[in-house]
Swiss-Prot record:
This is GTPase Era. Belongs to the TRAFAC class TrmE-Era-EngA-EngB-Septin-like GTPase superfamily. Era GTPase family. Monomer. It comes from Enterococcus faecalis (strain ATCC 700802 / V583). SUPFAM superfamilies: P-loop containing nucleoside triphosphate hydrolases, Prokaryotic type KH domain (KH-domain type II). Pfam families: KH_2, MMR_HSR1. An essential GTPase that binds both GDP and GTP, with rapid nucleotide exchange. Plays a role in 16S rRNA processing and 30S ribosomal subunit biogenesis and possibly also in cell cycle regulation and energy metabolism. Keywords: Cell membrane, Cytoplasm, GTP-binding, Membrane, Nucleotide-binding, Ribosome biogenesis, RNA-binding, rRNA-binding. The lineage of its organism: Bacteria, Bacillati, Bacillota, Bacilli, Lactobacillales. Residues 61-64 are annotated as: G3. GO terms for biological process: ribosomal small subunit assembly. Residues 123-126 are annotated as: G4. It is a peripheral membrane protein. GO terms for molecular function: GTP binding; GTPase activity; ribosomal small subunit binding; small ribosomal subunit rRNA binding.
Length: 300
């Protein structure tokens, strides 16, 4: 008897900085979603593709749900809600080392009206005592009737295989949408821009993160298979530009070196990376700039 192929879509939702991008990167086995210890680093719905012989699951890593403070914030939250509307399962992710807060309760209330089954994923279990984990499970169990509660460590991989088995079982019968070796539906230049932005967040001060965008101006492969990437880092203030460039260009060079290493790993080729920094005042509040920098509602 032949087993029918399964396929479907899964949304990953939760408060900012609970490990959604880390989980997605583990699922696909490669870095496609930006990771940082600073909140609200995922801005577009990143689609990662998990493929095994009997199933294919498309994962959507949404921006962390928060109270918007500007147009970009509105976009990020709307993007998260759109992701939850038409999926076969929703993973509500919380962090074991953070107490349940108003933000979690807000998301839970929205999830109660969800059409798809909701799984509670308790991440970072490697950071808490087992007794504390039991009390967390008990607390969340009182808030909503979850399909299943699955404790994991996205960083260490604890319980990861069980999570994937559960999700494959949940998926309906369906075709394989993407080739076996495709791990995201985003073009390479998008992933490249995210890798550069990740390094900016990693290396600069707290005032930078939510004011930065990265635009890849060109990506060209030469006759020696070396990839030439030109990209512009967009900030809102001259002071931020100074921080990113650094004394004698030192910070920009560091950003470029670290980003280049990740881009070479992604493309499996040598990369020549050129970076510029440009000031575009208040870009997060201007629709035209949001579109120019890749935030388009019709795409995400």
């Amino acid at each position: 008897m032949t087993t029918e192929h399964k396929s479907g879509f899964v949304a990953i939702v939760g408060r900012p900085n609970v490990g959604k991008s880390t989980l997605l990167n583990r699922i696909v086995g490669q870095k496609i979603a930006i990771m940082s210890d600073k909140a609200q680093t995922t801005r577009n719905k990143i689609q990662g593709i998990y493929t095994i012989p009997e199933a294919q699951i498309v994962f959507i890593d949404t921006p962390g749900i928060h109270k918007p403070k500007h147009r970009l914030g509105d976009f990020m939250v709307e993007s998260a809600y759109n992701a939850m509307r038409e999926v076969d399962a929703t993973l509500f992710m919380v962090s074991a080392d953070q107490k349940r807060g108003k933000g979690d309760d807000f998301i839970i209330e929205r999830l109660k009206n969800n059409n798809s089954p909701v799984y509670l994923i308790i991440n970072k279990i490697d950071k808490v005592h087992p007794d504390d984990l039991l009390s967390i499970i008990e607390d969340y169990s009182k808030q909503m009737d979850f399909k299943e509660i699955i404790p994991i460590s996205a960083t260490e991989g604890n319980n990861f295989e069980h999570l994937m088995d559960v999700l494959v079982e949940q998926m309906p019968e369906g075709p394989q949408y993407f080739p076996d070796d495709q791990i995201t539906d985003h073009p390479e230049y998008f992933i490249v821009s995210e890798l550069i932005r990740e390094k900016v967040l990693l290396l600069t001060r707290d005032e930078i993160p939510h004011s930065v965008a990265v635009v890849v101006d060109s990506m060209k492969r030469d006759e020696n298979d070396k990839v030439h990437v030109q990209a512009t880092i967009i900030v809102e203030r001259d002071s931020q530009k100074g921080i990113i460039i650094g004394k004698g260009g030192k910070m920009l060079k560091q950003i470029g070196t670290k980003a280049r290493q990740d881009i070479e790993y992604l493309l499996d080729d040598k990369v020549y990376l050129e970076l510029w920094v440009k000031v575009q005042k208040d870009w997060r509040d201007k629709k035209i700039y949001l579109q120019d920098f890749g935030y388009r509602k019709e795409e995400y």
